[in-house]
């Protein structure tokens, strides 16, 4: 759905052949938008700007959207949208469950690779960003009608499992007695033994061979470790209120059977060649080759990632693949996509994108660490935030802080600041939603004293917006009209901070409206119209928060 500003700009460009570059007016008396297109054209045409502006206005056919354009100053064109048009468009948001989000003309199958914790280790701060960002993409693209296929590429394979399983066997431990934190401690203990005892290290390597060969006892312990880990991961996903489930898990081990075929195809196509005993793919413009099979015959992460692309295109029928990982992996994905296209695993009509994110920093501006210098577990991070606010508010603070800046930027985790209900924070948006809800609930109780105080506000009949005489009303309605277009931009560019900025502006516009335009104290048609405007605002705020994965409370 094109917003009113976009429709207006398109109509003007169609009339004059130039993008008018509409900008929000600096003051209400100048209308809603200004354009300096006449000043730009005047330089080219060597004519007075006001004369050029007059010619432009004469060509415009926008009476169905705007009041008569005005020429101001040296040649600015001021435009004011018609109040009845604003009212009609904003009224649609009162009852539309999707709040104006248009369904994609050509729905796609979109694979999103995110979260990806490692088995036998607790999720840490780095997984926070991948999980929250990927979940936001999942919600936004699903809202547009795309089929989203989450892929949780957990680290469930590798030589480290030989070390851990051998330690468990030799210590005669019953691994079922441990939770994820206990298993992580076992991993750390096994690593110390591996580093200190060469004989244990040899036995651990032989255990890897047993794992790869399908030894029953080794596989039983390995599968138990995965089950314990998934239980821990799911507990964290539940705390984070994200959409990932066990059905989305596609661990490294799931590609094991595909790896020989992938390498054979690369060799057959002349892409993989032997170099110092390893099989490598040399890519033009890259300093180092991609190693798809190591000297010892083992397959590395690159081969697994190629197999994943091959399956996601071939079996999952992906039209678009999105990877959400640390920005420091950008080069890896650049090479991966190049090789996948060279091999034909990634056709030209399938889009592949890596969305990199920055680090989480402590209040001191340094990478977030424990006092001992270790990695902070995600559960400890959530516990820290919940010492400052209730769980749903703390989570809103964390998610909004994560999503509201450009993703590649590092951000400072300052729980005390993030949970504030003032300023550019998640709790501020929650408070705005609760405040709108409170007004509507009071209005419903005044109309019917017997109304259920817990009744669904969205299910009530709030009528339509019919009166927009005040600038604050018009500005709020204008912002509402942009919501669908903002979501479209976020879905295309994968820029959730733009949705955060929009929602913050919307909450601010509602605050101005609340101060300048009494709702419950107004009467007649004005009161009904303002209540409908409140209902539309509540719906858009709630839908927008949901796309960010943030709870929209009716009370705070």
Swiss-Prot record:
Q: List the disulfide bonds.
A: none
**PROSITE patterns per UniProt:** AA_TRNA_LIGASE_I (PS00178)
What keywords would UniProt list here?
Aminoacyl-tRNA synthetase, ATP-binding, Cytoplasm, Ligase, Nucleotide-binding, Protein biosynthesis
Q: What is its main location?
A: cytoplasm
Question: What family is it from?
Answer: Belongs to the class-I aminoacyl-tRNA synthetase family.
Which source organism? Cutibacterium acnes (strain DSM 16379 / KPA171202) (Propionibacterium acnes)
The reactions it catalyses are: tRNA(Arg) + L-arginine + ATP = L-arginyl-tRNA(Arg) + AMP + diphosphate
- The question of whether Aminoacyl-tRNA synthetase is a record keyword is answered with yes
The protein's assembly and partners: Monomer.
What this protein is called in its record is Arginine--tRNA ligase
Q: What compartments host this protein?
A: Cytoplasm
- Keyword ATP-binding attached: yes
What is the primary gene name for this protein?
argS
């Amino acid at each position: 759905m094109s917003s009113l500003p976009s429709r207006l700009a398109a109509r003007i460009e169609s009339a004059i052949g130039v993008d008018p570059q509409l900008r929000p007016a600096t003051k209400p008396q100048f209308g809603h938008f200004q354009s300096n297109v006449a000043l730009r054209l005047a330089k080219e045409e060597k004519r007075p700007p006001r004369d050029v502006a007059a010619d432009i206005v004469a060509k415009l056919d926008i009476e169905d959207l705007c009041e008569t354009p005005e020429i101001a100053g040296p040649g600015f064109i001021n435009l004011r949208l018609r109040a009845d048009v604003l009212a009609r468009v904003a009224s649609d948001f009162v009852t539309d469950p999707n709040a104006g989000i248009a369904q994609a003309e050509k729905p796609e199958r979109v694979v999103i690779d995110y979260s990806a914790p490692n088995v036998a280790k607790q999720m840490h701060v780095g997984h926070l960003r991948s999980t929250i960002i990927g979940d936001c993409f999942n919600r936004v693209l699903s809202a547009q009608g795309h089929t989203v296929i989450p892929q949780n590429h957990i680290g469930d394979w590798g030589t480290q499992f030989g070390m851990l399983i051998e330690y468990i066997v030799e210590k005669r431990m019953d691994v079922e007695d441990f939770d994820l934190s206990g298993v992580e401690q076992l991993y750390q203990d096994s690593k110390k033994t591996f580093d200190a005892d060469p004989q244990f290290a040899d036995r651990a390597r032989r255990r890897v061979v047993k794992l790869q060969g399908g030894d029953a006892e080794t596989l039983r312990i390995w599968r138990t470790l995965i089950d314990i880990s998934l239980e821990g991961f799911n507990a964290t996903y539940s705390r984070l209120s994200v959409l990932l489930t066990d059905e989305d898990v596609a661990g490294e081990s799931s590609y094991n059977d595909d790896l020989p075929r992938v390498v054979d195809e690369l060799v057959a196509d002349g892409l993989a060649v032997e170099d110092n005993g390893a099989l490598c793919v040399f890519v033009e413009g890259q300093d180092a080759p991609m190693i798809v099979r190591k000297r010892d015959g083992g397959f590395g992460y690159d081969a697994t990632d190629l197999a994943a692309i091959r399956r996601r295109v071939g079996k999952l029928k992906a039209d678009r693949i999105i990877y959400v990982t640390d920005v420091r992996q950008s080069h890896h994905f650049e090479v991966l996509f190049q090789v996948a296209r060279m091999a034909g695993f990634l056709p030209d009509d399938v889009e592949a994108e890596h969305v990199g994110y920055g680090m989480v920093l402590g209040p001191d501006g340094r990478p977030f660490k424990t006092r001992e210098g270790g990695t902070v577990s995600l559960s400890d991070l959530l516990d820290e935030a919940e010492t400052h606010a209730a769980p749903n508010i703390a989570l809103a603070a964390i998610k909004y802080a994560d999503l509201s800046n450009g993703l590649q930027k590092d951000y400072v985790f300052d729980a005390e600041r993030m949970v504030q209900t003032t300023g550019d924070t998640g709790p501020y948006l929650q408070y705005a939603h609760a405040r709108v809800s409170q007004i509507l609930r009071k209005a419903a109780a005044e109309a019917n004293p017997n109304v259920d105080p817990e009744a669904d506000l969205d299910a009530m009949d709030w009528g339509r917006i019919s009166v927009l005489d005040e600038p604050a009303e018009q500005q709020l309605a204008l912002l509402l009209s942009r919501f669908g277009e903002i979501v479209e931009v976020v879905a295309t560019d994968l820029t959730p901070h733009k949705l955060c900025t929009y929602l913050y502006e919307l909450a601010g516009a509602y605050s101005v409206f609340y101060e300048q335009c009494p709702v419950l104290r107004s009467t007649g048609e004005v009161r009904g119209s303002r209540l409908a405007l409140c209902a539309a605002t509540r719906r858009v705020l709630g839908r927008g928060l949901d796309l960010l994965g943030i709870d929209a409370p009716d009370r705070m």
